[in-house]
Amino acid sequence: MAGIKEECGVFGIYDLDGGNVVPSIYYGLTSLQHRGQESCGLAVSDTKGERGNVKFHKDLGLVSEVLRQDVVRKYEGDIGIGHVRYSTTGASVAENAQPLVLSYVKGTLALAHNGNLVNTPELKWELIQNGAIFHTTTDSEVIAFHIARERVHTRTVEDAVLKTAHKLKGAYALVVMSPRKLIGIRDPLGLKPLCLGKRDNT
């Protein structure tokens, strides 16, 4: 092996005191930059504000290039996720940058994903047969679509994430955000790193 292939990094944060998490996402992604240098982005929600108002910014480039200070000043929220990408599935194009943000019948869903699935073709074909149209070439979008689909038939987004997780085969770590909730999940064997931390009420 020529070297370690880090293959993406994910970050999620929720400030229970209502503070702005955007600076923390920026510094978190900067700390994770070694895990992916192709693209990056963030998605945030203000749980005190308009319901379903998820704002996001993503593009090709390093954290310092994509999330410049003049850009991040436009974003504010007390809940958010971020992503740095090293592509293993899907092309290195702006459309494949994350987080992915979907609007669907139950509202808005944002997802950042690290990992590889071995059953992506089967999961994608199931969605295509039911009319899904894909805008990226990533397995991350397949996961997001399945969560949204399950959410239509479940009581909570947590239930939808768990039902989707049972379908996934492979190594993965995900952070999933609805306008008022943040969920982190990894594969049962813990092959992809996902750490939980606490700072004050964040």
Task: Give the role of each language-model region.
Residues 1-202:
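Conserved short alpha-helical segments that host acidic/polar catalytic motifs at enzyme active sites
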